């Protein structure tokens, strides 16, 4: 069997050895997968594998095992490759069967006339780092790694080091030549530059033109590698926008970037479909390997959450962790509520609703109705820099977030909805292509007077659909395709938001700091890292807890609602009942309670009454203004 390090440093050697021993047995491929899955189940073995998210590409050894924490941004058409091919040994002149799985190119000449060639099928996913991942989460993932890497010296680059922008410019200025930008070989050894940085201009440009190479990140200014992931098994188990931690064999062979007439026919046969692609498709589907490395998947772990402070679920470690943390849920909740109250200028009611919003989660769907969503509109927010600082504080609490400044220019120019580019045969990303449980902060205080153009109207409509139905309708030109999502949306506004929401809470500051920036900075700096980590664990854990309502409490709630309707038939509606049930659920989970009690229901009614009273009071004040 392979040594303890071979499966990480030389996984292809493991694969080829198993192929040589068992190629007559059709189950050899399953044995390979079982071997690697078995290795990755060993305690702490996941942390031994270097991560593309943390380690610059030039530090990683080609053909080694790496992992990549990512979102599936696009899924390309299936492709054919040479699963088994025959080569002629140049020294002995004997024919040798080779395995083509988990490879992009052949090592030596292929016998093109061999009857032993086996053509197989695989699919390519275009994967990007999880959009909006918070700096604290990235840092925590990096610190937990036990992988030891040194700069790779496997091969020397055959060109001068160049930036992403230069590669991008080359592709812009030579759009007519088939794969012309790739004629200079790229090696991972040329990456003395920062391999993991992409220019924000690639994502902020509102133009639909995709003739230039970009990394197609959903959010502007994002950094990190993009990968072409080759998938061999379990294709039906993956969906667009899945968040995964992929373990696979890294391929950055310079031959991948030698295109057009210079490409070796034998390597082309590893993917014969390439010869049928248009130049635009080739540019999108076969970017330089030094910019977009290939990753041949051996194992993929779905990420139920993206919080590095929590153990992976479901495991024994996770169950034990949850049990121990539940004991202190109530005390951590009290500390977090006090912190948020200070952040919201002394408004305890708004702080409680913000806490409930942060743990909300779409736990199921009934027909088209997403259950569990809790979009909060925090109105009456101070202008200037308050909302920006509020977002920065929320960003420190959640693993993934994004602030959309709803200025007129942004709404008219930014692409929120992903769109299919039929020329390049790829999905052009949009800012609403986000991972599940991302906190989306919509800053409506930035909206000024002016005219929304057709693009702006479409963007506002897309935001409304996201809030109301937790779905985004992707633009496929001839039709729209609906993609469900699970995004926590917080809207900050001066008055009532122009967007729908599940709950509006007018902010009532109890303090008026002379220097808002200094006030909020002082509050944040007063929190120790250990305390912030408790808050982060609390928010992620609360949304994963199971929840139920007993028949007894259900009957009590129904009777109570009937009495409320009798007392005030005009004001109390079925919508109010639904909102109070959502609030009651979130209140229970925020306490670490997985069932609704009578006290929990009464508490939900009480804070909803306070909120409605405040909202009515605010309406009266606004109507009396000249």
Swiss-Prot record:
It comes from the Eukaryota. One of its GO terms (molecular function) is chromatin binding. Residues 177-196 have a biased composition (Basic and acidic residues). Transmembrane segments: none annotated. It is found in: Nucleus. Keywords: Cell cycle, Cell division, DNA replication, Mitosis, Nucleus. GO terms for cellular component: nucleus. One of its GO terms (biological process) is cell division. Pfam families: MCM_bind. Residues 152-216, 265-287 are annotated as: Disordered. Residues 197-210 have a biased composition (Polar residues). PANTHER family: MINI-CHROMOSOME MAINTENANCE COMPLEX-BINDING PROTEIN. Belongs to the MCMBP family. Interacts with the mcm complex: associates with the mcm3-7 complex which lacks mcm2, while it does not interact with the mcm complex when mcm2 is present (mcm2-7 complex). Associated component of the mcm complex that acts as a regulator of DNA replication. Binds to the MCM complex during late S phase and promotes the disassembly of the mcm complex from chromatin, thereby acting as a key regulator of pre-replication complex (pre-RC) unloading from replicated DNA. Can dissociate the mcm complex without addition of ATP; probably acts by destabilizing interactions of each individual subunits of the mcm complex. Required for sister chromatid cohesion. This is Mini-chromosome maintenance complex-binding protein. It comes from Salmo salar. The gene is mcmbp.
């Amino acid at each position: 069997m392979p040594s303890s390090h071979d499966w990480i440093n030389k996984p292809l050697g493991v694969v080829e050895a198993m192929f040589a021993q068992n190629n007559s047995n059709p189950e050899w491929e399953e044995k390979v997968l079982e071997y690697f899955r078995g290795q990755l189940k060993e305690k702490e073995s996941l942390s031994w594998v270097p991560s593309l998210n943390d380690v610059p590409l030039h530090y990683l050894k080609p053909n080694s095992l790496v992992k990549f924490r990512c979102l599936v941004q696009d899924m390309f058409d299936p492709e054919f490759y040479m699963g088994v091919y025959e080569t002629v040994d140049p020294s002995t002149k004997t024919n040798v069967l080779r395995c083509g799985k988990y490879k992009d190119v052949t090592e030596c000449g292929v016998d093109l006339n061999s009857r032993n060639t086996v053509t197989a099928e695989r699919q390519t996913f275009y994967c990007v780092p999880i959009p909006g991942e918070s700096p604290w989460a990235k840092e925590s993932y990096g610190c937990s790694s036990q992988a030891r890497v040194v700069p790779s010296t496997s091969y020397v680059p055959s060109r001068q080091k160049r930036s992403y922008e230069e590669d991008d410019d080359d592709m812009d200025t030579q759009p007519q030549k088939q794969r012309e930008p790739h004629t200079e070989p790229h090696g991972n050894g040329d990456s003395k530059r920062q391999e993991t940085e992409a220019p924000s201009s690639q994502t902020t440009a509102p133009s639909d033109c995709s003739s230039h190479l970009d990394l197609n990140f959903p959010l502007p200014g994002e950094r990190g590698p993009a990968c072409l992931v080759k998938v061999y098994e379990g294709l039906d188990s993956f969906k667009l926008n899945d968040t995964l931690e992929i373990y696979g064999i890294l391929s950055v062979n310079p031959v991948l970037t030698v295109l057009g007439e210079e490409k070796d026919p034998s390597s082309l046969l590893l993917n014969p479909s390439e010869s049928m692609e248009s130049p635009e498709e080739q540019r999108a589907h076969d970017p330089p390997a030094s910019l977009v490395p290939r990753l041949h998947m051996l194992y993929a772990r779905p990420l139920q959450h993206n919080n590095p402070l929590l153990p992976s679920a479901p495991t024994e470690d996770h169950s034990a962790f949850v049990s121990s943390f539940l004991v202190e849920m109530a005390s951590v909740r009290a500390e977090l509520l006090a912190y948020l109250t200070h952040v919201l200028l002394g408004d305890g009611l708004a702080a409680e609703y913000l806490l409930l919003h942060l743990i909300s989660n779409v736990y199921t769907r009934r027909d088209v109705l997403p259950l569990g969503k809790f979009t909060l509109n925090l109105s009456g927010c101070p202008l200037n820099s308050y909302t920006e600082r509020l977002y920065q504080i929320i960003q420190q609490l959640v693993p993934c977030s994004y602030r959309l400044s709803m200025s007129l220019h942004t709404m008219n120019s930014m692409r929120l909805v992903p769109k299919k580019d039929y020329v390049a045969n790829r999905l052009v990303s949009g800012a609403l292509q986000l991972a599940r449980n991302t906190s989306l902060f919509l800053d409506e205080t930035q909206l000024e007077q002016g005219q929304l153009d057709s693009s702006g109207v479409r963007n506002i409509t897309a935001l409304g659909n996201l809030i109301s139905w937790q779905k985004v309708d992707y633009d496929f030109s001839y039709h729209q395709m609906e993609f469900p999502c699970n995004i926590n949306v917080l809207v900050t506004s001066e008055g009532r938001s122009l967007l729908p929401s599940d709950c509006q809470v007018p902010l009532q500051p109890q303090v008026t700091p002379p220097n808002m920036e200094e006030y909020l900075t002082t509050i944040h700096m007063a929190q120790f890292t250990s305390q912030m980590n408790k808050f982060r664990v609390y928010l992620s854990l609360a949304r994963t807890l199971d929840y139920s309502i007993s028949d007894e409490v259900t009957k009590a709630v129904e009777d109570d609602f009937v009495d409320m309707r009798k007392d005030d038939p005009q004001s109390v509606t079925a919508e109010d009942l639904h909102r109070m049930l959502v609030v009651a659920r979130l209140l229970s989970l925020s306490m670490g309670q997985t069932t609704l009690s009578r006290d929990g229901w009464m508490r939900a009614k009480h804070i909803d009454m306070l909120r409605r009273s405040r909202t009515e009071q605010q309406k009266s004040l606004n109507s009396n203004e000249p």
